[in-house]
Amino acid sequence: MEGLEACIGQSHEVMTTPAAELAAFRARKVALITGISGQDGSYLAELLLSKGYKVHGIIRRSSSFNTARIEHLYSNPMTHNGDSSFSLHYGDMTDSSCLIKLISTIEPTEVYHLAAQSHVKVSFDLPEYTAEVDAVGTLRLLDAIHACRLTEKVRFYQASTSELYGKVQEIPQSEKTPFYPRSPYAVAKMYGYWIVVNYREAYKMFACNGILFNHESPRRGETFVTRKITRSVAKISLGQQESIELGNLSALRDWGHAREYVEAMWRILQHDAPDDFVIATGKQFSVREFCNLAFAEIGEVLEWEGEGVEEVGKNKDGIVRVKVSPKYYRPTEVETLLGNPEKAKKTLGWEAKVTVPELVKEMVASDIALMKANPMA
């Protein structure tokens, strides 16, 4: 298959590829990761390289460097030997021709689609862009695979989200729980979810959704609430900051560790048949409880006073460490998310092992080290 010529004139008929040809194709172990420079993409790249894959990643062109999370891989001579185990390519989920070109050139055996505008609150400010990237971008990537006649050969993973459940219809949420999205981000991801199902059913593509509940790590983006908390706690411990402003302290979430969740992504694509899975811990904590755990790591116990936007968290000396600001509330809040991971445990043999206290401990320690080395980080 050479260049774009192989992708022109593709019919919508379902092709049948001989088993021997499929086996030989998959034995190549070539992965393409969109969103490779993000939290999940960086952990997934590490995992796949450790399993002997050739890893290709798509990054967006930027005037500033945005590859900090994967710099250790890109500069590692072990991933830049003669067979080029790790490669990065410029691309964008809004550019169909670029995606077709990459798919036809790389011919991946597995595609992990992680790229997204993934900040829920930002999606209210940028609803059209969020839909363009998260919804239509997923379609573009699936259609690129189909256009390049790789529909039967490629295994496709779509990073779906617990935000699909939004105004939850049952607790806990499983693969059978009805969706009720409460943000432009969640609505866009719901389209992504169903277009994956559609391509699986229409073209017999090995296409899967991982409905991942919140997952964190020291590599989490600084604007997400968990990382915002641990960064602020680190700064407070070093005298660089006095307090932190947050939104809904009572919001309940099912938090896990991103490093474990990318293992689930890989297992989903190694399963015998394509399917959709909830990936979660099955345990729930509030934002307030996350704050308590984080401050405990620097020896401070918080006492909470007031309600709503008047609520504050004070240390034993009466110093206010946590304040509530209306600007961090979403127009439509998602009050509670709790996943039921039984299907993943039974079918994939996957279950979360890192507890939330362990996760918080790791994140706070990492941010303290970061702030000591670079107070302006």
Swiss-Prot record:
The organism's place on the tree of life at top rank: Eukaryota
Functional pathway: Nucleotide-sugar biosynthesis; GDP-L-fucose biosynthesis via de novo pathway; GDP-L-fucose from GDP-alpha-D-mannose: step 1/2
Q: Which reaction does it catalyse?
A: GDP-alpha-D-mannose = GDP-4-dehydro-alpha-D-rhamnose + H2O
Record-listed NADP(+) binding positions: 35-40, 92-93, 114-118, 129, 189, 215, 220
- Catalytic residues as annotated in Swiss-Prot or TrEMBL: T161, E163, Y185
Q: Does the keyword Acetylation apply?
A: no
Extract the InterPro entries matched here: GDP_Man_deHydtase, NAD(P)-bd_dom, NAD(P)-bd_dom_sf
Alphabetically list the UniProt keywords. Insecticide resistance, Lyase, NADP
Instruction: Return the Pfam families for the record.
Output: GDP_Man_Dehyd (PF16363)
**Major enzyme class:** lyase
Alphabetically, the GO molecular function entries are: GDP-mannose 4,6-dehydratase activity
Keyword Lyase attached:
yes
In terms of SUPFAM superfamilies, this protein maps to: NAD(P)-binding Rossmann-fold domains
Q: Which GO terms describe its biological process?
A: 'de novo' GDP-L-fucose biosynthetic process
**Entries under PANTHER family matching the protein:** GDP-MANNOSE 4,6 DEHYDRATASE, GDP-MANNOSE 4,6-DEHYDRATASE
HAMAP family assigned to the protein according to its UniProt record, in alphabetical order: GDP_Man_dehydratase (MF_00955)
Q: What is this protein called?
A: GDP-mannose 4,6 dehydratase 1
